[in-house]
A protein has these predicted regions:
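Substrate-binding pocket helix/loop in short-chain dehydrogenase/reductase
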Residues: 51-52, 59-64
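Active-site loop-to-helix junction immediately N-terminal to the catalytic Tyr of the SDR YXXXK motif
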Residues: 101-110
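Conserved NAD(P)H cofactor-binding loop of Rossmann-fold oxidoreductase domains
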Residues: 43-48
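The beta1-alpha1 cofactor-binding region of Rossmann-like NAD(H)/NADP(H)-dependent oxidoreductases
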Residues: 15-26, 57
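Residue(s) in the substrate-gating loop at a strand-loop-helix junction
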Residues: 95
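C-terminal helical subdomain
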Residues: 138, 155-191, 195
Length: 219
């Protein structure tokens, strides 16, 4: 509500627990009945850091529910709605993590974002083959100055970009028809380098970066 008051446009607020599958379905049933929505952005998600066997299982499951299940449900419903209208844009906010082979010490988070990038790439292929006017894309940023750090318990080794810049850049690229959106040159270079290196080597390099993020710094 506080955010809505700062905007010039009219806002409608829907309360939804995205970690609950039934709540996601109820939300999408409401949204899919409308014909005045043509941009949908899956932006919810969170991470956690630590050795895989030591991280909280309940937090892992909640992360899977929000990052994977909710994204899957919301994307499917909005895609159906947009295809009926033969127009619309869907942006799935993934991460540069989803373009890398793996992320030791953030194993679950990296796996969830790999799901998002794979799903989005596959749906894009289907839409292109059908010559659809619906466009789907994925935003894969590196560090962004949001509350993600506190939730995940990390301190980024690289400087983050502002949320405002990330959002404006992402929307501009989406409307240009870009499918994979990586906002900064540094992350673009890192993604390209990881694809050239063997998977195990790329994961080992990522592990070193993850260790720099850990606030507990146990290793």
């Amino acid at each position: 509500k506080e955010l809505a008051q700062t905007l010039d446009t009219d806002c409608e607020i829907y309360a939804c627990d995205l970690s609950d599958g039934k709540s996601c379905i109820k939300l999408e049933r409401k949204l899919s009945k409308r014909n005045d929505i043509f941009v949908f952005i899956n932006n919810a998600g969170f991470g956690d850091i630590g050795d895989f066997e030591r991280t909280s299982l309940s937090k892992d499951i909640s992360m899977l529910n929000v990052n994977v299940r909710a994204t899957h449900i919301l994307t499917k419903y909005m895609l159906r709605s947009f295809k009926k209208m033969n127009r619309g844009y869907i942006m799935n906010v993934a991460s540069s993590a989803g373009l890398l082979p793996g992320g030791p010490y953030m194993a679950t988070y990296y796996a969830t974002k790999s799901y998002v990038t794979s799903l989005t790439t596959s749906i894009n292929g289907e839409l292109k083959a059908a010559h659809s006017n619906v466009h789907i894309c994925m935003l894969c940023p590196g560090p962004v100055d949001t509350n993600f750090n506190n939730t995940a318990g990390v301190t980024f080794a690289l400087p983050g970009i502002s949320a405002e810049y990330c959002a404006s850049y992402a929307l501009l690229q989406m409307f240009k028809g870009k499918v994979t959106i990586v906002p900064t040159f540094t992350m673009k270079a890192a993604v390209i380098a990881s694809k050239l290196a063997p998977r195990e080597l790329a994961a080992a390099i990522t592990a070193k970066q993850q260790m720099k993020k850990r606030k507990d710094n146990k290793h």
